[in-house]
Amino acid sequence: MTLLNNKVAIITGASSGIGRATALLFAAQGAAVVINARGERALNEVAETIADLGGRVHAVVGDVGLAQTHERLVQAAADRFGGLDIAVNNAGAVGAIKPLAELPLEEWHHTLNANLTSAFLGARSQVPSMLARGGGAIVFTSSFVGTSVGLPGMAAYGAAKAALMGLVKGLTADYAVKGIRVNALLPGGVDTAMAGDDAQKEWAAGLHAMKRIASPGELAQAALFLASPMASFVAGSALYADGGNAAVK
């Protein structure tokens, strides 16, 4: 069974990690995927992999902190595949890691732009296209940082990721009645470049009840659930995929 047959999905941050795994999985589940990242070479490699496996894919290089990037993504979904049903607003950045009193204002703005403003810009562009199709599903990649735990030097990142939950709830209040489900995926530690070196990954594993970090594919499966008909009555929710961190913190 293909859960996303004939659906069209936008996935940002798709050149590596959770975004790459999500793009591959969604394409395997029948969706046409419009993928985005800033790095052209890595993004094109993902697109080639999907195409070689028989998937439908189109790559759009761009910075999700800019409104025009999201407009181009939505337009590509319409032009190439006929519309938009699903968006996984996954792109983000940890930003500078330092105590809040030492954080320059420009770094604060950079971190919020990469993680929160980018999500707002994405949803603002995506909602009208979904309404034209009678509904859809939006998934934001948040984090256990800021929602379940605070980590040293990551106040800006945690604030941005926690604020995504306010965006999820507000969008749900506005658009659930019109058929758009909006939810957040909250990963714990994940085996990606963002997680750091082996020592940092081992430290992160200790934060979880399962005493390990996730693979990107495990998070992609959670995103698939939220985007698919399996979650047809799930709206305005936070799905912790954190290896039990929230249960034992």
Name each model-derived stretch.
Residues 8, 15-16:
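Conserved glycine-rich cofactor-binding loop
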Residues 123, 160, 168:
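Active-site helix of classical SDR
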